[in-house]
Amino acid sequence: MKSLMTSIALLSLAATAVAQDQQLGARTKAMGGSYTAFEDDPVSVWLNPAGISTQPDQLSIAYQTYTAYPKGRVRGPGDTVDFTVEPSTVMGDPALLPSYIGFVFQVGDAAAPLAIGVCYAQPYLLNYAMDQVKDPNQPVFVPEAEVQQVFGRFRISAAKDFRISDVGTEGFFTHVSAGLGLDVGYTRWHFSGLGEDTTTSNVGVGFGIGGLLGVYDNYNSFKVNLGVAYTSKVSYDFQIDPDILPAFDMPQQLNVGFTFYLLQGTPLRITLDFQWIDWSSTAQEPLFSNFDGFEDAMNYSIGFEYRLTVSERVSLYPRLGFRLFDAPWSDKDDLPMTGPFRLVLDTKDEVFTLFTYGVGISWTTEAGKVRSVDFAGDAGGDAINFAIGLTMEF
């Protein structure tokens, strides 16, 4: 069975790489994007590779939507045509491709867990309307052009868990896990407007590293994990010149988070996370010094999950979360510039307070394998977004 699933994994991921999200996974989204100290979710292959170290063989697939700012047209007064740049909810590109598909293979044993993970992740989909600025004192900006860029990443990772104290022994610093992922990044870029209609694609390499520490565990009603993960930037060697047409690299990011397991049997989980995303180094410096460039984002999240026992084999997981989401601009009325192009879009704010929600249901088969389906949504941003996921042990 394992060899069959391995073959399926490699074939699926190969197809994905050929065909080509910020917080990936329905469970992650429902809990405010708070995920760095997860140790039981196969999406950790991407989120924090150390988190898969003790996981069993399993598969995870997730679809989700993204916020885009496409250029549209509406009829204005008389026979005029007005441009619109309103936010909208869109599927990934292509729509049939999952935002995440990944596999975990446990190749160690209970005494010395060692896991291998493979995945394809699409964490970002950019769709911005822009205006080419030729005068530093230009007062009005019109969405003359549109840039669309999809970022995907194929990863293979390994994670090892090291016991510090024996299982069942209450105390601090019970175990530590370390994980490393090697990545091939893929981007597809399209620019339209100003007499241009250009599409290109490119690949680059990157990596991700992560650690997970069991801070405390009484094996009864209280447990704390600390997770740290870093994902490198992927730089692309475009055939177009970013000084002439706007294009972005895939940003590096750093995540630090805690997970708390509470109450008898630990049915309650609370997660806290901080995330830094280096958007400032992914774009060109503004052509004119009186315009702002893209800035880094710092996001803060808290999530809640509670396990409700429906039957001996079925559990229900209601989830809630809050996320302080930082857009890569400092002023919604003075949007950033990359090279000679300034963003032109309708946005509500610079920092958004997102309310997230979701539910999961899991069941155990007669063979003892766990299956789960998860749904999530969020509100409070420029557009609402949703995610759905499937996880299954094999």
Positions of PLM-derived features:
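Short intrinsically disordered, low-complexity coil segments enriched in acidic
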Residues: 2, 80-87, 199, 204
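Cleavable N-terminal export/targeting peptides
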Residues: 1-24, 166, 170
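N-terminal, post-signal peptide beta-strand-biased segments of exported outer-membrane/organellar beta-barrel
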Residues: 16-122, 346-350, 355
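A broad, structure-centric signal for solvent-exposed, well-ordered loop/edge residues
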Residues: 7-8, 38, 311
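Outer-membrane beta-barrel porins/channels
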Residues: 20-29, 98-394
